[in-house]
């Protein structure tokens, strides 16, 4: 048995060869490979996705270690997408992984050629950039899935999937909807979101991110390193909220699950497959 076949033998056992071939042909792009996007990327590669583009402008910070897949004490200061790509290729060396150290904005949107992809995954934190991606992605023929806020959560049983306009109890979704209404710009079609209606409060001390006490890449690379230009993102956040790995990972896994189930729905004879969109929407509604 070839190594490539052996890697995905257990997946093929469940889904069948035709479904695995379908998965391998899909092209996916993920925007944001932090606490949610990094786990989504690994799950997709382990599930058989071979054509994956990962987009993030940031470098690994020591405060990422508690929740981001590629963040370790050895990767602090490295470009996130490069560190993640290296890990993904150890899982499937034949995968075609494109790592883009870029940020998605209204100004850079044309650089990503979204029309080339079958699936677009949104794991962006910035409200403005997230809104811009949603509007553009919904103009393409690609399937689009989005993550709402994963911070200030503890209970994994409250994580769910529903259509964007049906999301309840999530401040990020509320802010996005208000922005769309205020600017009178709306997504051209409905799309599924992963979210939680839980909202806790920060119980610890104020974060030092972006201050002189910050332990981000400058602590390892030195204050003269040009990569610190990207560190502005940390200090520009209005508020730093607490996050936990088990929550962000579940968000990422559920996004990956939406891709895999959508890609295999028309092929697999296993009843549970393909039912997630309808079932979760009904529960949330």
Residue ranges and their predicted role:
Residues 1-29:
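N-terminal charged helix/coil linker that caps or initiates catalytic domains
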Residues 30-32, 55:
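Conserved N-terminal Rossmann-fold NAD(P)-binding element of oxidoreductases
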Residues 101-109:
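Conserved SAM/SAH-binding loop
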Residues 2, 115-119, 124-129, 143-144, ...:
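Glycine-rich phosphate/adenylate-binding loop
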Residues 63-70, 153-163:
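Acidic/polar active-site rim loop that often engages polyanionic ligands
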Residues 49, 54-92:
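Glycine-rich phosphate-binding loop and adjoining beta1-alpha1-beta2 segment
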Residues 36:
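Hydrophobic/small residue at the entry helix of a nucleotide-binding pocket
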């Amino acid at each position: 048995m070839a190594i490539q076949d052996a890697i995905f033998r257990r997946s093929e056992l469940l889904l069948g060869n035709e479904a695995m071939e379908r998965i391998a042909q899909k092209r996916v792009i993920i925007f944001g490979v932090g606490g949610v996007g990094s786990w989504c990327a690994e799950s997709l590669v382990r599930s058989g996705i071979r054509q994956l583009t990962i987009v993030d402008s940031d470098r690994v910070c020591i405060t990422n270690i508690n929740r981001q897949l590629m963040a370790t004490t050895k990767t602090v200061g490295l470009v996130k997408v490069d560190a993640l790509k290296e890990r993904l290729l150890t899982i499937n060396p034949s995968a075609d992984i494109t790592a883009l150290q870029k940020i998605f904005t209204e100004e850079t949107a044309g650089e990503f050629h979204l029309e080339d992809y079958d699936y677009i995954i949104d794991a962006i934190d910035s409200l403005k950039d997230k809104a811009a991606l949603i509007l553009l992605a919904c103009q393409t023929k690609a399937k689009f899935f989005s993550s709402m806020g994963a911070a200030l959560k503890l209970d994994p049983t409250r994580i769910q999937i529903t259509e964007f306009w049906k999301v309840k109890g999530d401040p990020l979704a509320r802010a996005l909807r208000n922005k769309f209404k205020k600017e009178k710009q709306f997504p051209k079609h409905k799309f599924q979101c992963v979210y939680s209606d839980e909202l806790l409060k920060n119980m610890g001390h104020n974060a030092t991110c972006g201050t002189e006490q910050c332990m981000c890449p400058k602590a390892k690379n030195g204050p003269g390193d040009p990569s610190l230009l990207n560190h502005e993102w940390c200090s520009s956040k209005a508020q730093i909220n607490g996050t936990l790995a088990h929550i962000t990972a579940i968000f990422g896994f559920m996004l990956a699950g939406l891709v895999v189930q959508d890609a295999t729905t028309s092929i697999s004879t296993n009843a549970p497959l393909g039912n997630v969109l309808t079932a979760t929407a009904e529960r949330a509604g």
